[in-house]
């Protein structure tokens, strides 16, 4: 999946590039596998911004993705590989032998016409989903469950991949894409392989409007604000922040401060923090 650049016809196409994939099919999504979304522009019931730099964007239909992969021992055929505006990865439409149709994340290397399988007896092949206890050490995996039966929650972005590095005492040790090493029940399932569209991070938007299409608003520097809006604000002309260290709009340290809450339930499962 190479990066596709634009011809320089206007200033916004000078540096713009997108992910290109010849095998992707440009089709409307399966209507029964979509649902509407309500966007609140990151405002709560009183109209107050609760998450900055979000709002606007193109209307989207949510594609219902099968993160559980619980169609055990029922083979499915990859029919299409489609674009999903709600995530960086592509998705596949799967037709199962029992007549069901589902969307799944597109594993790297899986093409239209390939067959996938789920369940404890599924072979070790890219796109198949099975419990961690049935996988050999060193297997590359994605869409990993944390809670048994809840569905995959880890390693779902484009190009994401984790590694199974150990199994002991009914627990599996995984190295996650962030570099974190943690324990997960070996009964939890995962999908073999790496998520596709590995060049998603190499694309260049080319203009601010391309980010507005995605629902991302611009960020304003604190020193450009008034003192009422940010601790860095105020002063005559171009002035420094007036502090030893940068802070957030709420006065907390902005660089190097650990933001994870103490005594979380998952602390005992994390063997090494992320890098």
Curated annotation (Swiss-Prot):
It is found in: Plastid, Chloroplast. It comes from the Eukaryota. Residues 224-275 are annotated as: Disordered. Gene3D superfamilies: 2.30.30.30, Nucleic acid-binding proteins (2.40.50.140), Ribosomal protein L2, domain 3 (4.10.950.10). InterPro entries: NA-bd_OB-fold, Rib_uL2_dom2, Ribosomal_uL2, Ribosomal_uL2_bac/org-type, Ribosomal_uL2_C, Ribosomal_uL2_dom3, Ribosomal_uL2_RNA-bd_dom, Translation_prot_SH3-like_sf. Keywords: Chloroplast, Plastid, Ribonucleoprotein, Ribosomal protein. One of its GO terms (biological process) is mitochondrial translation. The keyword Metal-binding does not apply. GO terms for molecular function: rRNA binding; structural constituent of ribosome; transferase activity. Part of the 50S ribosomal subunit. Belongs to the universal ribosomal protein uL2 family. This is Large ribosomal subunit protein uL2c. The gene is rpl2.
């Amino acid at each position: 999946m190479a990066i596709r650049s634009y011809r320089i016809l206007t200033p916004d196409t000078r540096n713009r590039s997108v992910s290109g994939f010849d095998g992707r099919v440009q089709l409307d999504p399966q209507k029964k596998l979509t649902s509407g979304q309500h966007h609140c522009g990151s405002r709560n019931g009183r109209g107050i911004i609760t998450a900055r730099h979000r709002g606007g964007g193109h209307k989207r239909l949510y594609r219902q993705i099968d993160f559980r992969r619980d169609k055990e021992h029922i083979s499915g055929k990859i029919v299409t590989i489609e674009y999903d505006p709600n995530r960086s990865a592509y998705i596949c439409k799967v037709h199962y032998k029992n007549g069901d149709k589902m969307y799944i994340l597109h594993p790297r290397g899986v093409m239209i016409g390939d067959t996938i399988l789920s369940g404890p007896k599924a072979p070790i092949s890219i796109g198949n989903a099975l419990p961690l206890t049935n996988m050999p050490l060193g297997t590359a995996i994605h869409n990993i469950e944390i809670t048994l039966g809840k569905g995959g929650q880890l390693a779902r972005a484009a190009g994401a991949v984790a590694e199974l590095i150990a199994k002991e005492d009914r627990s599996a040790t995984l190295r996650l894409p962030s570099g974190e090493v943690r324990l997960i029940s070996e009964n939890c399932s995962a999908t073999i392989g790496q998520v596709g569209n590995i060049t998603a991070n190499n694309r260049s938007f080319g203009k601010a409007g391309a980010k507005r299409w995605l629902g991302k608003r611009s960020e304003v520097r604190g020193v450009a604000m008034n003192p009422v809006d940010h601790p860095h604000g105020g002063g005559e002309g171009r002035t420094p922040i007036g502090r030893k260290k940068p802070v957030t709009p709420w006065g907390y340290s902005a660089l190097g401060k650990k933001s994870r809450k103490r005594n979380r339930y998952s602390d005992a499962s994390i063997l090494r923090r992320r890098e």
